[in-house]
Amino acid sequence: MNLRSIITARHIQNAPFWQIVWEWEDAIASYLRLPLVKQQPYLFGSKATKLDRLLFRPCVFPYSEFLLGQSDLPALRFHINPPWVHGYHTRSNVVPIVIDCWRNELHRIPVMFRRQKAIFVCNLEAVNILKASEPLLPIHYLPVSLPESDIPNEIPQKDIDILSYGRTHPDLVQWGHQFASEHPEVRFCWIGTHEGRPVWYEKGQKTEMGSSRQALMQVLARSRIVLQSSPGMHAQEFERTGGFSPVTPRFFEAAAKCCHMVGIYPENDEFRRLRIADICQRVTTYSEFHDEVKRLLITRFGTNELTRNQAFLRANTTERRAEDIIRVLQLS
């Protein structure tokens, strides 16, 4: 079984975290020669009407699919989280890829996707729980990735010593500041948000930076060491994720820009399976952090490290994920 298209929401979603999804869609579409089709979420606009809610109720679904037409070949659709309401994007001939699925969202997977031929989830902890609790549900693990075009051929010039960005563990941020205060010659920068816009911070000064993914990747290319962490590793994040700590695309992004990495992350099945320890040094105390950062600052990122990162990224390209999707569908 093949796919007929990829349903994209890029015309109705503009949040920065969707940008990597568009890259995945483009890479899969190019590799499998599939068209990108704009999502039409509901019958009369971008919000669900009473008719939509009736038409896409599970008990009415078989009739709505008959009325709306059904293709023999399924389409692919990315979801940041499991959807809350039924729509065109949850029909049985749409194969979902759910990127973030936290513990308190698990129940929505069987509710929304019970009639799918295959369901892909990018969080191994969630997949294992769903397989145990819903053994008849066609759940499959699909790790996050980067397109093959992001594999580096050379090492970029570096002028930032330590970079923190995204949802970094607060201990890492504190340790970064402490290290910079103890070593004034070190250039420590971090990317946060101000009034919803990405902001670059350095020595108490903030500068607005572009919200494009290209702007972020350019900063990564300039960074020697990137601080990494997984969701769910401190109290606030634990509450948000229910303790789930998946591998995020940030590890792949920093690997693509030839950065050393120091991080706080679990030694769970997903991190071991993807061999994150090969590219990111795990620390648990400031003493370990200090020694590791100090060592990496004087360790040149050379050809051995470049070769290692190339191998890591080749094993985790979006194109390989596309092959995995087709392989699963052919067996479904």
Question: Each predicted region: which residue ranges?
Answer:
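A charged, aromatic-enriched C-terminal amphipathic alpha-helix characteristic of glycosyltransferases
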Residues: 284-287, 294-331
